Design a protein with these regions (language model features):
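Conserved ABC ATPase "signature" region
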Residues: 99, 103, 110-128
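Conserved ABC transporter NBD signature motif
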Residues: 59-70, 74-75
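ABC ATPase "signature
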Residues: 215-216
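Catalytic Walker B motif of ABC-type/P-loop ATPase nucleotide-binding domains
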Residues: 157-161
Length: 244
């Protein structure tokens, strides 16, 4: 099984504060990997490192075959990334956004044109073609942002709280898109604060105070910790850490 992310003893410090404390895990091709943790748990710091935006204090990190210390620029060019703010330009049209990001990733005009036609048809955006992104419903913005994040067919895409603020039906539709992308062999690395969404992942890790306190499939973790839901497990881990 191809490994797209390999992390070994990752430590990130800010002065005396340890944001990431000896993190070790692997993520595989075509896997949907949930990266869970409360605000301040350290997951955002770790994601910045995995995306090539920051260096670790120590430890080994490889993403898509590239070393974080030597190949940060290559990592940035070979991953997809979607933030909860969607990273779209509201004053540009749909086609202009696709053209802009396709150009950043070095795609040819022919490929960009083909992708534009494909996305407009897939999302039913014919009536919005000449209108700015700001005119789009939130759910459609979300789906378009995801498609643009994988326009260059990266081995891995990072999704940072991608379903924040959308209704349950749109969330479900978005997850269908995630499954379709994973079926193509793309690794999907996702953070979410919706504990029910964790159940949709192949495996999840749960961070508490800078450490990974649980790692495995949702079923494995619920069985191991004797909980009915991932939310119960999350609360249990937080309480255990606080009591210790």
């Amino acid at each position: 099984m191809e490994t797209t992310v390999k992390v070994n003893n990752l430590v990130k410090k800010f002065g005396d504060f340890v944001a990431n404390d000896n993190l070790s895990f692997e993520v595989y091709a075509g896997e949907i990997f949930g990266f869970l943790g409360a605000n301040g748990a350290g997951k955002t710091t770790a994601i910045k490192i995995l995306c090539g935006l920051s260096k670790p204090t120590s430890g080994e990190v490889n993403v898509s075959g590239f070393n974080i210390y030597k190949d940060r620029e290559k990592i940035k060019k070979n991953i997809g990334y979607m933030s909860q703010r969607f990273s779209l330009y509201d004053d540009l049209t749909i086609a202009d956004n696709i053209k802009f990001y396709g150009g950043i990733y070095g795609l040819s005009r022919e490929i960009i044109k083909a992708k534009t036609d494909e996305y407009i048809e897939e999302l039913g955006l014919e009536e919005y073609v000449k209108r700015s992104i700001s005119d789009l419903p939130l759910g459609i913005k979300q789906k378009l942002a995801f498609l643009i994040a994988v326009i260059h067919e990266p081995k891995i895409v990072f999704l940072d709280e991608p379903t924040s603020g959308v209704d349950p039906i749109t969330r479900r539709q978005f997850w269908n898109m995630i499954y379709q992308q994973a079926d193509k062999g793309t690794t999907v690395f996702i953070t979410t604060h919706y504990m029910d969404e964790a159940e949709y992942c192949n495996r999840i890790s749960i961070m508490v105070d800078g450490k990974i306190e649980a790692l495995g499939t949702p079923k494995q973790l619920k069985d191991n910790f004797k909980t009915e839901t991932i939310e119960e497990l999350f609360v249990q881990l937080a309480r255990n850490t606080k009591n210790n």
